């Protein structure tokens, strides 16, 4: 569907889950980046979310650490220019280690950029994550990469995790924003353990 705004996206997503699972069926919910912000806001809608896991969630409202200005890939005139723009943007925004920027990562990133149906950039800076987490009372895991440029993980640990007994924060060393791609060997077991409870 076409979404007019973030709130309508959250409402439609929550309604779809209720329709598919029923209003009282417990389920676990996870999201990455903007999907983490959406997941937190869906969980705040009163659904039967047992446990929530957010990987490098957007919408925190805290400081960012830019690594480089993103290239406008829509201006690419050739396949080579598009490939180079995507490679650079992965380095500048998503992945810390150069060797992780492989054809598979570039392919996923390119497909996602070309096929996105919702422009999230302006929403991710609005600070909508904290209020949603304050409403959702269940266990919440947030995983950040140490070099995530979309945030300052230590700052968020202090402001979103400390003093919140239902929240757990993990900062993974030597990875960037796309933690679930760049370090699946560490992220996958963390998620399996989190949702196994």
Give residue ranges: language-model regions.
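Active-site loop/oxyanion-hole signature of alpha/beta-hydrolase fold enzymes
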Residues: 1-30, 45, 189
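Conserved catalytic-core motifs of eukaryotic protein kinase domains, centered on the activation segment
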Residues: 1-2, 64-66, 153-154
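Catalytic nucleophile loop
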Residues: 31, 35-36
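Flexible "cap/lid" loop of the alpha/beta hydrolase fold
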Residues: 37-44, 50-81
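Conserved alpha/beta-hydrolase catalytic His-Asp/Glu region
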Residues: 65, 80-138
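Conserved loop-alpha-helix segment in the C-terminal half of the alpha/beta-hydrolase fold
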Residues: 141-175
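Catalytic active-site module of serine/aspartate enzymes centered on a nucleophile-bearing elbow/loop
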Residues: 165-197
């Amino acid at each position: 569907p076409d979404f007019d705004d973030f709130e309508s996206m959250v409402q439609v997503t929550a309604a779809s889950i209720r329709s598919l699972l029923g209003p009282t069926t417990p389920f676990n919910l996870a999201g990455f980046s903007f999907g983490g912000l959406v997941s937190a806001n869906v969980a705040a809608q009163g659904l039967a979310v047992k446990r929530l896991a957010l990987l490098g969630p957007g919408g925190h409202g805290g400081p960012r650490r830019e690594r480089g200005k993103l290239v406008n890939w829509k201006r690419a005139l050739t396949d080579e220019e598009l490939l180079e723009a995507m490679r650079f943007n992965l380095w500048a925004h998503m992945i810390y280690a150069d060797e992780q920027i492989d054809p598979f990562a570039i392919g996923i990133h390119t497909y996602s950029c070309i096929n996105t149906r919702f422009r999230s950039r302006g929403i991710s800076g609005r600070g909508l994550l904290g209020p949603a987490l304050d409403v959702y009372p269940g266990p919440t895991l947030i995983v950040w990469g140490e070099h995530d440029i979309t945030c300052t993980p230590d700052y968020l640990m202090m402001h979103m995790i400390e003093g919140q007994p239902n929240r757990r924060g993990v900062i993974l060393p030597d990875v960037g924003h796309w933690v679930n791609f760049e370090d699946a060997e560490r992220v996958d077991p963390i998620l399996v353990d989190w949702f196994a409870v």
